């Protein structure tokens, strides 16, 4: 007999290396836009949740294996991923951004030809750059923060990642103050959804209903202002 969704504590997993979306406080407590959003969903949907910080590499395998119930990790909704998992309606829309030393600009991804570009293993930025096939050398990291450290040290020429992450490192990180700027934003939007295993229909319906409410009553925009400084 299946246990009702509301009767058990659901494990939510995310890779807490993407401020302001998902990251750890100095006391190692998960925080960020996605974290606040999933807690708001849980409150409205009468769900008990606990959050687990996991590495991005292998995060989908862990969901498939049943190690956790929901992914809340800035997970881009793609046709390939939808073949294996179910996604909620989007809770955030983003574009890929290229960060370079402050003052540098490029007109397209093609301008990265011959440059070394850092990113995190398996994220959309890597896929976008690979598909563009512009002749850039891609250097992948376990943590996007390491890519920005190498950018600051001159070991890579640029970093590509989701625009809220790019803006955080370019504008809000005091240790990188004045060092970085957004050199280019790719014009193909992507949408983040919470991700569950196939067949979890009751859970998916609860999540979607709560997301729709959060959008309708302005709570989503309040979270955007809190974490990104703007609701745009």
Report the location of each language-model feature:
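Extracytoplasmic small-molecule ligand-binding "clamshell" domains
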Residues: 7-75, 83
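Short helix-initiation/N-cap motifs at beta->coil->alpha
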Residues: 35, 51-61, 104, 124, ...
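Extended ligand-binding regions for polar small-molecule ligands
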Residues: 35-44, 110, 115, 121-123, ...
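Alpha-to-beta junction loops
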Residues: 46-48, 65-73, 115-116, 134, ...
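Ligand-binding clefts/hinges and TM-proximal coupling segments of bilobed small-molecule sensing domains
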Residues: 48, 124-141, 177-182, 209-232
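A ligand-binding cleft/hinge motif common to bilobed small-molecule-binding domains
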Residues: 58-61, 73-83, 128-131, 157-188
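Flexible hinge/capping segments at coil-to-helix
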Residues: 100-116
């Amino acid at each position: 007999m299946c246990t009702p969704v509301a009767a058990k504590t659901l494990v939510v997993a995310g890779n807490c290396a993407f401020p302001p979306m998902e990251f750890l406080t100095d006391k190692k407590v998960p925080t960020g836009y996605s974290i606040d959003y999933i807690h708001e969903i849980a409150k409205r949907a009468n769900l008990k949740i606990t959050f687990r910080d996991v590495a991005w590499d292998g995060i989908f395998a862990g969901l498939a294996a049943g190690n956790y119930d929901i992914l809340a990790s800035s997970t881009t909704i793609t046709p390939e991923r939808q073949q294996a998992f179910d996604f909620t309606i989007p809770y955030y829309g983003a574009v890929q951004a290229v960060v370079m030393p402050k003052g540098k600009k490029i007109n397209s991804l093609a301008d990265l030809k011959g440059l070394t570009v850092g990113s995190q293993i398996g994220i959309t930025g890597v896929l976008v750059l690979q598909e563009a096939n512009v002749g850039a050398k891609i250097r992948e990291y376990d943590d996007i923060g390491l890519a920005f450290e190498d950018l600051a040290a001159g070991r890579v020429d640029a970093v590509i990642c989701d625009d809220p992450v790019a803006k955080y490192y370019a504008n809000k990180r005091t240790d990188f103050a004045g060092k970085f700027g957004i050199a280019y934003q790719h014009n193909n939007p992507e949408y983040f959804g919470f991700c569950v295993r196939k067949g979890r229909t009751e859970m998916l319906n609860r999540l979607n209903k709560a997301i729709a409410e959060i959008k309708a009553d302005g709570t989503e925009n309040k979270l955007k202002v809190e974490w990104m400084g703007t609701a745009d």
